[in-house]
Amino acid sequence: MNLIAAAIAIGLSALGAGIGNGLIVSRTVEGVARQPEARGQLMSIMFIGIGLVEALPILGLVISFIVLFQ
């Protein structure tokens, strides 16, 4: 049962991060297409957002390790 819970925790967090990263990158590409002069500012904001979104799978991994080795 712990193995299933750990797999669900890491799977759902990876799924959420994948969807979030896709949305962030697509909106950034749309913004650059509309305003090419704002490319640098949009890219830095995008990288900060991706870093925050990638914290979710790391937390999912930690939670799955806690559940797995409990």
Swiss-Prot record:
The UniProt entry, under CDD domains, shows: ATP-synt_Fo_c_ATPE
Q: Which domain of life is it from?
A: Bacteria
Cited Pfam families: ATP-synt_C (PF00137)
Q: How does it sit in the membrane?
A: Multi-pass membrane protein
- What is the first-listed, main subcellular location in coarse terms? membrane
Assembly, in brief, is: F-type ATPases have 2 components, F(1) - the catalytic core - and F(0) - the membrane proton channel. F(1) has five subunits: alpha(3), beta(3), gamma(1), delta(1), epsilon(1). F(0) has three main subunits: a(1), b(2) and c(10-14). The alpha and beta chains form an alternating ring which encloses part of the gamma chain. F(1) is attached to F(0) by a central stalk formed by the gamma and epsilon chains, while a peripheral stalk is formed by the delta and b chains.
In Swiss-Prot or TrEMBL terms, this protein is called ATP synthase subunit c
Protein species of origin: Staphylococcus carnosus (strain TM300)
